[in-house]
């Protein structure tokens, strides 16, 4: 059975983080389902910079699926929409309780995970200007933070979306596949390519 990911989208989600992650996961052979968390259930999502994305389904229709990871892109307005969605918060909690991976980038860790106390323990990172919203004992100033104790993956922002997507591939499919995908990209220096 192949790995699968549920990528949540909301009005104001950060498009670079969403699209980069989706693209890399597909390249890694991971089945991706995109879910709209828009309060009106609209599948057409206008992202933070005006780019329009079309979700596969409203979250209510796919939340109970057997996905291996739930992905929360950032973008402050999108993250606030996630934070205010009872269904989204409960879905994230269910992933955590069932031992599946929760992956959040940019504004999502500080705006969604922390206020709902979903990970009272667990190291994390996020958008640097939101550092004060994450407990000091949990904050790590790194491009990507994987805390295997609680199966939490976090990352900092649009410029770390490739690192984030590759780490999800590594976790779900393996290091070899992450390296294969990385080798197809012309990556900036400093991004780990899974080759060592």
Curated annotation (Swiss-Prot):
It holds the Pfam family DJ-1_PfpI. It catalyses: N(omega)-(1-hydroxy-2-oxopropyl)-L-arginyl-[protein] + H2O = lactate + L-arginyl-[protein] + H(+); N(6)-(1-hydroxy-2-oxopropyl)-L-lysyl-[protein] + H2O = lactate + L-lysyl-[protein] + H(+); S-(1-hydroxy-2-oxopropyl)-L-cysteinyl-[protein] + H2O = lactate + L-cysteinyl-[protein] + H(+); N(omega)-(1-hydroxy-2-oxoethyl)-L-arginyl-[protein] + H2O = L-arginyl-[protein] + glycolate + H(+). Changing residue 106 to D: Does not complement a disruption mutant. GO terms for cellular component: cytoplasm; cytosol. Disulfide bonds: none annotated. The modification Cysteine sulfinic acid (-SO2H) is found at residue 106. Cys-106 is easily oxidized to sulfinic acid. Gene3D superfamilies: 3.40.50.880. Disruption phenotype: Cells lacking this gene display highest sensitivity to carbonyl stress. The yajL mutant (but not the parental strain) suffers from a 100-fold decrease in viability after incubation for 48 hours in LB medium containing 0.6% glucose, and the mutant is rescued by YajL- and DJ-1-overproducing plasmids. The wild-type strain displays a small quantity of glycated proteins after overnight culture in LB medium supplemented with 0.6% glucose, whereas the yajL mutant displays much higher levels of glycated proteins, and also higher DNA and RNA glycation levels. GO terms for biological process: cellular response to oxidative stress; DNA repair; protein refolding; protein repair; response to heat; ribosome biogenesis. GO terms for molecular function: protein deglycase activity; protein homodimerization activity. It is an enzyme of class 3 (hydrolase). Keywords: Chaperone, DNA damage, DNA repair, Hydrolase, Oxidation, Stress response. It comes from the Bacteria. Glyoxalase activity is inhibited by zinc ions. Active as a chaperone in both its reduced and oxidized states, and is more active in its oxidized form. The active site is at 106 (nucleophile). InterPro entries: Class_I_gatase-like, DJ-1, DJ-1/PfpI, Prot/Nucl_acid_deglycase. Its EC number is 3.1.2.-, 3.5.1.-, 3.5.1.124. Homodimer. Protein and nucleotide deglycase that catalyzes the deglycation of the Maillard adducts formed between amino groups of proteins or nucleotides and reactive carbonyl groups of glyoxals. Thus, functions as a protein deglycase that repairs methylglyoxal- and glyoxal-glycated proteins, and releases repaired proteins and lactate or glycolate, respectively. Deglycates cysteine, arginine and lysine residues in proteins, and thus reactivates these proteins by reversing glycation by glyoxals. PANTHER family: PROTEIN/NUCLEIC ACID DEGLYCASE DJ-1-RELATED, PROTEIN_NUCLEIC ACID DEGLYCASE 3. Belongs to the peptidase C56 family. This is Protein/nucleic acid deglycase 3. The gene is yajL.
